[in-house]
Regions:
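Active-site cofactor/cluster-binding pocket
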Residues: 1-193
Length: 193
């Protein structure tokens, strides 16, 4: 990867979009990349729309601003398709990854003519099966890695097991559940168009 890759995350407060963007930044850093991972804060509350960003490159990153023309967009909550222009500035050569069970025709229509690639994944089903609760950020992290090719599946899994062991040292069942969610998501993300 020679070029700068820019990712914009759309989620709702409490869904873990910010955490996922920071985990992606850490994982990319650990593969030798230069990184940025940051949220955009306002007066948001639990459930309010939020935005987070990533920049990942093989070279030092000298730009320090929000991302207006991302290569990839991650939509953690598909209800945002009805109230946020998630494709704003999204490059046609990039892709959007949506947590959704809605049919492909609905997604294409909701994206208002976006011409690039569209992927979806059922992060709810994966997280509830793997973790016993709805935490969409872990499956969405794996999905964007798979779609973007920022790092290999193996690099992601190796980094995340270490990260989860540190974060959940006294909760091994949470480590196992998160690893299962990552593995499932890497296999289940599907191309819509």
């Amino acid at each position: 990867m020679d070029n700068l890759i820019e990712i914009r995350w759309h989620g709702r407060g409490g869904q873990g979009a910010k955490t996922a963007s920071l985990l992606l930044a850490d994982a990319a850093f650990n593969t030798g990349k230069y990184i940025q991972g940051f949220p955009e804060y306002g007066p948001e509350r639990m459930g309010a729309p939020i935005v987070a960003y990533n920049r990942i490159s093989d070279n030092p990153i000298t730009i320090h601003s929000n991302i207006y023309e991302p290569d990839y967009v991650v939509v953690v909550d598909d209800t945002l398709l009805e109230c946020v222009d998630v494709t704003s500035g999204l490059k046609k050569t990039g892709a959007i990854v949506i947590n959704s069970t809605k049919d492909n025709d609905y997604l294409k229509e909701a994206l208002k003519g976006y011409e690039g690639s569209v992927y979806k994944i059922d992060a709810r089903k994966i997280s509830e099966e793997a973790l016993g609760r709805y935490f969409p950020n872990t499956p969405m992290l794996a999905a964007i890695v798979k779609v973007s090719g920022i790092m290999s599946d193996e690099e992601l899994l190796n980094d995340m097991v270490g990260s989860f062991k540190h974060k959940f040292a006294k909760k091994p069942e949470v480590i196992d559940g998160n690893m299962k969610a990552l593995e499932m998501a890497l296999k289940q993300v599907e191309k819509v168009k």
